[in-house]
């Protein structure tokens, strides 16, 4: 009888109709930061996996060395890792940016070279030019992908500056 109960529990927990990630709404929305006149809310756009992200020193005046925390379990190897950023406001593209995070001959981070199934947890600075975020609402699409263009992580974010 215990085997039947265990099988039923597994079926209920993995059934698309009972779990939020199988619905139209996708993964839950997370707040990466909310203070200093700036709010960043994101949702994973990868249908198979969610991840964690937080931003320290949340402010409309973004510092040149911004500290973040990021955690995920890899579904793909990352010999090479790339970040694409698309910034939009009022439906118009403002910025498209692509940056290599891991290259075989120049790994920039300790997680470069990690394998499928391993966990990445990064807590540290992210270098950026530093800027003042103008008042308004912005949409960000962030995509991390490996050398085979396989998605490592993907997020739709809303940035609100007041």
Swiss-Prot record:
Subcellular location field: Secreted, Extracellular space
Tissue: Highly expressed in spleen, liver, brain and thymus, and at lower levels in kidney.
GO BP of this protein: inflammatory response; innate immune response; lipopolysaccharide-mediated signaling pathway; positive regulation of lipopolysaccharide-mediated signaling pathway
Keywords of this entry: Disulfide bond, Glycoprotein, Immunity, Inflammatory response, Innate immunity, Secreted, Signal
Signal peptide as annotated in the record: 1-19
InterPro entries xref list: Ig_E-set, LY86, ML_dom
Record protein name field: Lymphocyte antigen 86
Sugar-bearing residue positions: 96, 156
Main location class: secreted
SUPFAM superfamilies: E set domains
Top-rank lineage group of the source organism: Eukaryota
Gene: Ly86
SMART domains the record matches: ML
Role summary: May cooperate with CD180 and TLR4 to mediate the innate immune response to bacterial lipopolysaccharide (LPS) and cytokine production. Important for efficient CD180 cell surface expression.
Disulfides per UniProt: 33-58, 45-154, 102-112
Record-level GO cellular component terms: extracellular region
Assembly and binders: M-shaped tetramer of two CD180-LY86 heterodimers.
PANTHER family found in the cross-reference section: LYMPHOCYTE ANTIGEN 86
